[in-house]
Curated annotation (Swiss-Prot):
RNA-binding is among the record's keywords: no
Gene Ontology CC annotations of this record: cytosol
Root EC class: transferase
One GO MF term attached to the UniProt entry: rRNA (guanine-N7-)-methyltransferase activity
Keywords from the named record: Cytoplasm, Methyltransferase, rRNA processing, S-adenosyl-L-methionine, Transferase
Name of the protein: Ribosomal RNA small subunit methyltransferase G
Function: Specifically methylates the N7 position of a guanine in 16S rRNA.
GN (gene name): rsmG
Chain ranges passing through the membrane: none
Length: 196
């Protein structure tokens, strides 16, 4: 089911990626029963609205010609790992730091790292307290854009990408460029990006 849903959106998974996404899905469903990590409960919807939506930014990377080799990514407000962990599974060779301030979510991310045998780092703190700089900073479902963009830009020495779903305000385009995507389950999806 996972591979087919990805392929429907134009993303190809190898067996290892499919296996890791399957483990991720199982663990998310299991942990979600106790810890309420996501409001989306149906497996197919988790694959679409969390895994595929997270990976969709790859199309933006391709459009702007972003060379990902050796890049250090930061996922700010990672929650249950979105978009960082799906991107790590899909892109494989990126260096990834997940920044999350809620301890139960940090525990899940650390546990998931072991289950997936992935190499990423979890910083269990508020983004404002992080002094480190990253090549690519990502944020998805992180509150009001106007309130978080300064924090995201402070963390970046390269690019900032902000997933906005189907919501778009004209004033956001003063400082940020627009990457418009179309997925079967979300005909209009916007990702704002900026080279810092």
């Amino acid at each position: 089911m996972i591979r087919e849903l990805f392929e429907k959106e134009g993303f190809t998974l190898d067996e290892e990626q499919e296996r890791k996404f399957s483990i991720y899905l199982q663990e998310l469903l299991r942990w979600n029963k106790v810890h309420n990590l996501t409001s989306i409960k149906k497996p197919e919807e988790i694959v679409r609205r969390h895994f595929i939506d997270s990976v969709s930014v790859v199309r933006c990377f391709e459009r702007i010609g972003l060379d990902l080799r050796g890049k250090h990514f930061a996922d700010v407000g990672s929650g249950a790992g979105f978009p960082g962990v799906p991107l790590k599974i899909y892109l494989k060779d990126i260096k990834l730091t997940l920044i999350e301030s809620v301890s139960k979510k940090c525990s899940f991310l650390e546990y998931l790292k072991i289950k997936l045998n992935e190499d990423y780092r979890v910083l269990c703190t508020r983004a404002e307290k992080v002094e480190e700089k990253f090549d690519v900073v990502l944020a998805r479902a992180l509150g009001e854009f106007e309130e978080v963009k300064e924090i995201l830009e402070k963390l970046s020495i390269g690019y900032v990408f902000v997933y906005k779903g189907s919501k778009l305000k004209e004033e956001w385009l003063k400082d940020y460029k627009l990457c418009e995507l179309s997925l079967s389950f979300m005909p209009k999806s916007y990702i704002l990006w900026k080279k810092v």
